[in-house]
């Protein structure tokens, strides 16, 4: 008696068709998805840039950076760091089309301990942006140093 190879395959295929989706879902309860893979115990630690470094880049008209302001649009329109684009803080940001993955993104906020900046930077890193920095002490330090600002309009 000869064994039919399809007879062995049938149970596997049937299992695949009728098994609950959770059987195949990747369990990532103790980690974070990074580039589609679960990394257990992943903790994002941001790189920081000082306001002095950022001012130098702005003064030298650096083409290698994009400044990202996490404020709500009306606040950003009122006043922001020169050249900053607006990417409002959100718990789930989508990959913004206007941000280049080739440039260094410098994220800042007007918040205590740079919390919103760190969260947006973390989300951007999870979306595949590899060159992301947080402006140390953010907007308030920028103003304290009396560096230039601009408004939309």
Predicted features by range, described:
Residues 2-9, 14-66, 75, 153:
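Flexible, polar/low-complexity N-terminal or interdomain linker segments that lie immediately upstream
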Residues 20-22, 81, 139:
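A generic alpha-helix preference that emphasizes hydrophobic side chains
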Residues 5, 24-43, 116-148:
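Thiolate-centered catalytic microenvironments shared by cysteine-dependent enzyme domains
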Residues 101-103, 147-151:
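Short, surface-exposed amphipathic charged segments that create phosphate/polyanion-binding patches used
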Residues 40-113, 119:
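Positively charged, proline/Ser/Thr-rich regional signature most characteristic
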């Amino acid at each position: 008696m000869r064994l039919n190879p399809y007879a062995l395959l049938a149970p596997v295929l049937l299992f695949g068709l009728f098994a609950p989706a959770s059987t195949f879902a990747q369990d990532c309860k103790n980690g974070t998805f990074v580039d589609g893979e679960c990394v257990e115990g992943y903790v994002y630690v941001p790189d920081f840039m000082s306001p002095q470094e950022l001012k130098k880049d702005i003064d030298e008209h650096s083409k290698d950076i994009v400044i990202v302001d996490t404020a709500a649009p009306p606040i950003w329109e009122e006043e922001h760091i020169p050249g900053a684009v607006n990417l409002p803080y959100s718990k789930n940001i989508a990959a913004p089309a206007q941000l280049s993955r080739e440039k260094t993104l410098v994220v800042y906020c007007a918040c205590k301990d740079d919390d919103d900046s760190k969260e947006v930077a973390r989300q951007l890193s999870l979306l595949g942006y590899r060159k992301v920095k947080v402006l140390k002490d953010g907007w308030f330090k920028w103003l304290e140093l009396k560096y230039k600002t601009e408004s939309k309009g």
